[in-house]
Amino acid sequence: METKEEKKERRQGYFARLKKKRQAKQNTETVSANSPGSPVSKTPAEKDDESKVILEQISSSGDNCKFAGEKETVPEKEKRKKKYNQLKDIRRTELKRYYSTDDNQNKTNEKKEKKMVSQKPHGTIEYTAGNQDTINSIALKFNITPNKLVELNKLFTHTIVPGQILFVPETSVARLPSFSPGAPISPSSSDAEYDKLPDADLARKAFKPVERVLSSTSEEDEPVVVKFLKMNCRYFTDGKGVVGGVMIVTPNNIMFDPHKSDPLVIENGCEEYGLICPMEEVVSIALYNDISHMKIKDALPSDIPKDLCPLYRPGEWEDLSSEKDINPFSKFKSLSKEKRQQNGDSPNVPGAKQINPSDKEKSADFEVLQSSESTGSIKSKSLEFYNNITATEHLEKFAADPHVKEPSEEKNVSDIRTKEDSLSGGGDDFIDLEKVPSPMDRGLDRKISLMEGLLADPRELGRTKQQVTKPTTEVQEHFTVDSLEKKDSVEPKADLDLELCEKQDVIPEVNKCVSSPTGKVETALDTKKELEKDKLIEFYLNKDGSGSQSSEDLHKAEIQKGENNKAIGIDLTLSCSKSQADEVHTVKSMELDSCCVGRKAASLESSAAAAEEKDLKESLDSSLVPAVDKTCQETQLDNQSEVRLWLLQKIQVPIEDMLPSKEEKSKTPPMFLCIKVGKPMRKSFVSQSTTVSQQYSKKIKQPEYWFAVPREIITVEEAKRRKSVCSYYGEEDDDDALPVLKHHSALLENMHIEQLARRLPARVQGYPWRLAYSTLEHGTSLKTLYRKSASLDSPVLLVIKDMDNQIFGAYATHPFRFSDHYYGTGETFLYTFSPNFKVFKWSGENTYFINGDMTSLELGGGGGRFGLWLDADLYHGRSNSCSTFNNDILSKKEDFIIQDVEVWTFE
């Protein structure tokens, strides 16, 4: 029995040891589980279930114990209680661990989600990079810069890998569908509406290139602020005309696009005139008031000698729009290429060139003006015209006489004709000639009818004969040239002479004092120009020689009266007394009336002219030959000296008189912009290869490009401000309105303010004037002036009054300050009211505008002289003529003593 009991105890000891080990193991786990958090509280139902399970286990273990041992002792009960408690604790720890692990996982997931949400920027969506995607392509697709995309995704490099998730702006994705795989893009409201359409599926299957589509609610519908200049201008090409267009200046390029409506663009195409130039190639840019610095072909009209025009200001530069006056020289009526060929290569057919009716009247007016300057009355004008006709007709008859002509004369006269034609620029006339089959001179019948009553009065003929001084001089000139043309049959030269006669502005008088050699030279020069006038008459009569002779008897009685006075032609041709202005206008109206009559009866006029031509040749046969023989040797001069005298006389005429247009100069002429570049500008409408081959071949010097630009360029904000001001004042003319002065001025009166306000730049007009410094309030110190001007950020107006009570000063684009060098812009100017108001603007020679230091304030300089100089105490001042403004002395004396100083700003 004892052995069996010992075995039982041994078995219990074994299980007891196992339980102890298990219990110790569980205790360590409970300690570790209890440490992170408090025990989990449980409901009473859960506690009952757990206790039931534990009791069942205990009962089963108790049965085993009973089976093992028959009687239970007291220590065994205590052990059972301990086991029960231990099992209960184990169960609690397992449940606690279960619930605690779930909570920890949820918390970590929540933290990850919160972290993901915080990393995603607001207003962005995820985009998965594809195989062909780069940072630049993605940025371009979503309208964002690459640097902004890198900053948005907090990337360290610009390198991405396929499948990488990036954040992109959501607004761009709503407008642009992504084509990369795996991009989690949710359809926007616009896409949802698009899906409701019946053909949405078909539309989505259609291939569409990737492009930007601006929605109505997009932020990019708002105008983007880009700094650029856009202005209408004219481009002076080098030998290809002057073209109007638009110049666009950006921070990177300078571009010029010609107007498609420009005549030269229509004729030659836009390829010749479109320009583009990078800013890196620009060497210098300068603005000039005139085009005297221009050294290209199209600086002046082609018919004016370039060396005779050091300064030329074109008139009527009203605006630079594409619709009005595109060509700046459009007022000069230049011939086209076809008309120039007609003038140069006209056929040798009599009557081939005529003047059209509108230009006929102009030539008639010109002809009457010529005759009016050489006669004393309306009657003498008519007689001169009539006798010129008789003289030239008889000279044609004498042209066949071989004893009178000399070969040297023919050569000399032909040289004179060719040189004069080359100097006169016959290729570019301002009166257009056309081939119109006109029968004869329109005003001939009217002139003959006027002379019918004049020839009957012998007293008038006696007066005109007394005016003759050297009759044979001009007759010899008529004879030599007429005989030369009769021999060589040079009809096109008559056409050119007609154009030359119509172009002449100055009709000389015959010099009556011909005793000295200079007098002879002047006489020859005058008779040479009178010859041009007679050539005009001869041209009309020669081309009508084939007219009908049916009306010869109608004018026979009138011509017989002319035969009784054979020397009248010579007498009246050289009459040179000045006429009055009212007589000129009277004859003009008569000539215009004769033109109208001539159009109605062309056939009658032609027959009358033919009859008159025949009889007048017979009337002066015997009277002209002796006079021609006597003075043939006296009138021959050196050809070179004659041409030189003619050229000198042309040079002495003012340049304004040489121009066809004598209009009043424009009040706002343009500025001339000169752009010097390192390489020639590329043509924007020509392919790259041809552009390089055409333009980069000449690298002799830096190319220059000239443009006529507006004098005033304003910003869009300034244009809006002006528009608002105009709308505020309505239709009232506010040009005379005085600006608002916030403070009272001790120096400026209303007259001064009004005149100054008109000359101020546009960007300060309309702003009120505020007094920034005054010697009466702040004392006489230049340092105080600097201190008061330090806080200003706008142009200032300096007003000075000296001890002579003279008011003058300057407008400065920048407030006065200490500086180591000159500053300011070309808007700076000097002005004076001594004695009259004058403004001296920038001359363009240098940029010495404003300079301030501790000892003085200087405005304008050059050559050691200052336009305006003030000392540190604002007591002494000096004014000299400087090259910056080309100004006069502003005060009465160069050195002056300052009485008061005011500085006004515009705010």
UniProtKB/Swiss-Prot annotation:
Region (Disordered): 1-51, 63-83, 99-121, 335-373, 401-443
Segments forming a coiled coil: 1-29
Any one GO BP annotation for this protein: regulation of transcription by RNA polymerase II
GO cellular component, one term: nucleus
Regions crossing the membrane: none
Compositional bias of kind Polar residues: 25-41
Main location per the UniProt record: nucleus
Key words, A-Z: Activator, Coiled coil, Nucleus, Transcription, Transcription regulation
Cross-referenced InterPro entries: LysM_dom, LysM_dom_sf, TLDc_dom
Biased composition (Basic and acidic residues): 1-12, 68-78, 99-116, 401-422
GO MF term list: transcription coactivator activity
Pfam family for this entry, one: TLD
Domain LysM: from-to ranges: 125-168
Residue ranges annotated for the TLDc domain, each copy included: 746-907
General function of this protein: Enhances the transcriptional activities of several nuclear receptors.
Family stated for the protein in its record: Belongs to the OXR1 family.
Identification of the protein by name: Nuclear receptor coactivator 7
Gene label: NCOA7
